[in-house]
Amino acid sequence: QEAEAAAAFTEKAAAVASRIPGSPSTFNNVCADHLYKWLSEICELSEFLSSWIRLQDLLASLPAKAERQLAHQLLESAVDGALWPDLYRWNVVRSRLSALTLAQPQLSLIRASDQVARRKRFAKTEDDLRRLDRAEVIAAIHNDPDDCQQGISDGLKADFTEMALIRNESVKRIKHRPLRHLFQYAGSALRGLKPCWMMSPATVASLLPRSKGEDFDLVVIDEASQMSPERALGVISRAKQCVVVGDPQQLPPTSLFQRNTAWEDSDDADEIDIDVLEEESILDLSSKAFQPTRRLKWHYRSRNGSLIAFSNKHFYDSQLVVFPACRREFAITRHLVEEPRYKKGVNEPEVRDVCDIVIRQLELYPERTLGVVAMNEAQADAIAEQLDDLAFHHDELRRRLDLRDNSESLFVKPLEKVQGDERDTIVISTTYGPSEPGGAIPLRFGLLNRASGHRRLNVLFTRAKHAIELVTSLKSNQLRLPATAGPGLLAFRDYLRYVEKGSVDSESATVREPTTPFEKLVFGLLSSNGFTADCGVGFSNYFIDLAVRHPDAPDHYLLALEGDGSNYNSARAARDRDKYRQSVLEALGWNVYKVWSTDWFDNPEGEIKKLVAQLKRLRKSVVIPCDRTEDLRAGNVISPRPRDGTSPRDPT
């Protein structure tokens, strides 16, 4: 047996010796001198043997020679093994970046200073192009009268047409031709002089003659949700092309006394397209008949996301792009009326509170425009009358009321007449309530009970740019709605609840923890320099990568850091990426700092020094606006009243 074992060992040793450089005698000497020692050491390290074998397998499985070399260097170095994964990833990223730079040399030219200059040049060129476009349009439509159709200028003046007719009418002092005659016999010359006309459907029907459809190259119907198909037909028939613009979630055509029995009684009823009869607006009909359709998603009006958050979720399926404000606040203030009394369409205590708030707004925010909206015309008239009385002793109120049809005027309107208007601050009177304090609340809410009630509310909730002052006699839990309640009543109750809570579930302003390595790096460096940052600041479909809080006012953001990652690259057009987004943020009060990953990759320490220096400069220069909200809520500004306690119109 010993002889067999020796023979087997000799055979295996010979096989091993054949793989080792040198003569067999050398191997035999090595075996004789060191074999026992090697075997002893292996036995002592047997617990690490399996790990060593696994390591050799992993080294052999590395796909690239450079990666295997790096692994061997790490094994031979004194670097802590806990750092090996980061060092390995860093080496892989560095090698791949080098390969990418070799393949695309322009990447090596991207530096922050150059990119900033390019973006400024691009923005300026874009602005110049828009100015040139406007100038080109003005030049194109500025026609000399001699270049327009001259028409008939001989014979009887009653037979004059085109420019001859216009010139003849322009020198008259009396006995002018009716406008319809002018449009009929001088239409071509008028379109030559003034190619763009703005008219209502009623004006088109009453003044313009019948057309063959070639009067205008293009007709644009705005606020199309409020126009019925029959009113739009005469407008559309006069143009070669039509663009219909409107919001299907806003006011439908409104005629409180409209009846649709005429079509039903018609002898031709069977030939009428039933879809037309069922459409409530030209917008609804056009969205089915015309293609393509485009949905505009960027929301500009609200300077605070809380003003549009409710509508975005309930009416627009959270599809709007809402840019965040640079101040963390809820911009809707609720004023609950004490002892409300709603009788015959008017809530007098609510009228009084609305007027008090209007006066306080004028005192606290004289720079802001102001509008008042009530749920019905009776309430709006009552508010307007009381404000008119108060204006007798309040000069600024009188000045605002006298600015009729001006963008700075103070308007008081019922809900039905407010679409298309906007003001910095909107005071809303919800009007409805119990007939006596503590009494039952009947579920009679006027037009809100109709199928389109929620659309009316959407108009109401989206008129403000800066703030909403909600004056109400109701709490959301007082509206015990039946299972059959329509969308208008449900939206009304939910909005009251939204204002009471100060958030709307997923649509409230969000922040998150840093997730990407870049965010973690910048977040940590900012913290070590004494600044606090929030990641992913925003409301809906647009989020700022990192927003740095003002150290002296934590509710204000000092700076928005915008990177060049997925958020930047999500924009399809350079205009969006490099101009419009930043323009919108700056209009909302943000200071925007653009971060370029190439610079941060090469020199993170230098980039953080530049960023911190910018933050310190802004901290000294940025003026924090005074918060006057608490004064408004507390009523610290006294509403002026007549000195003798009576109304200026009171005969006593």
Predicted ranges, named:
Residues Q1-D86:
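Charged C-terminal transducer/switch regions of large nucleotide-driven machines
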Residues S51-D215:
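Conserved helicase NTPase catalytic core signature
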Residues A189-G192, A202-L218, Q226-L521, G538:
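Conserved helicase motor core of SF1/SF2 NTP-dependent helicases
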Residues E223:
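Catalytic glutamate of the conserved HExxH
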Residues R231-G234, R238-Q250, G453, L457, ...:
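C-terminal, active-site-flanking charged/polar segments
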Residues L525-L558:
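Active-site metal-binding core of divalent-cation-utilizing nuclease and nuclease-like domains
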Residues A547-Y580, T598-D602:
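Short beta-strand-loop-alpha-helix junction that forms the active-site gateway
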Residues E586-T652:
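Basic, glycine-rich
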